[in-house]
């Protein structure tokens, strides 16, 4: 018989830097999960992606065991890294903060492809370009 899922927790944690401190500790603690065990596993799995924020979905089962799935970093973080900026524009329609090339957008789209509900790289590119526009980043040909 399959184990019964009693909770799903979605977090965004810096790669390789999960600690029992908030937000990780309280989110896992209320479901009775072994917090240190999760932190060690997550840090080991994401050690090669240092500096990125990794979304993770943790499924907690009735016997307090858990499984987790890591996703690709959010598009906004990848765009900021590609453009070399710390912060997106507060007024994206009037203030443009950076420009990125179409090649960079394609690179990000290919990286994000497993997590996007896009059928082709072109449609994924338009999603990434839309995110860039809403951040005040210009996409040039």
Swiss-Prot record:
UniProt PTM comment: One or more lysine residues are methylated.
One Pfam family, short name: Ribosomal_L11
Keyword terms, alphabetized: Methylation, Ribonucleoprotein, Ribosomal protein, RNA-binding, rRNA-binding
Coiled coil start-end: none
Taxonomy, superkingdom: Bacteria
GO term, biological process aspect, one: translation
GO MF annotation: an example: structural constituent of ribosome
InterPro entries reported in the protein's UniProt record: Ribosomal_uL11, Ribosomal_uL11_bac-typ, Ribosomal_uL11_C, Ribosomal_uL11_C_sf, Ribosomal_uL11_N, Ribosomal_uL11_N_sf
Entry's Gene Ontology cellular component terms: cytosolic large ribosomal subunit
CDD domains in the record: Ribosomal_L11
Similarity annotation: Belongs to the universal ribosomal protein uL11 family.
Role played: Forms part of the ribosomal stalk which helps the ribosome interact with GTP-bound translation factors.
NCBIfam families: L11_bact
Subunit structure comment from the entry: Part of the ribosomal stalk of the 50S ribosomal subunit. Interacts with L10 and the large rRNA to form the base of the stalk. L10 forms an elongated spine to which L12 dimers bind in a sequential fashion forming a multimeric L10(L12)X complex.
Name assigned to this protein: Large ribosomal subunit protein uL11
Organism: Alkaliphilus metalliredigens (strain QYMF)
The gene coding this protein: rplK
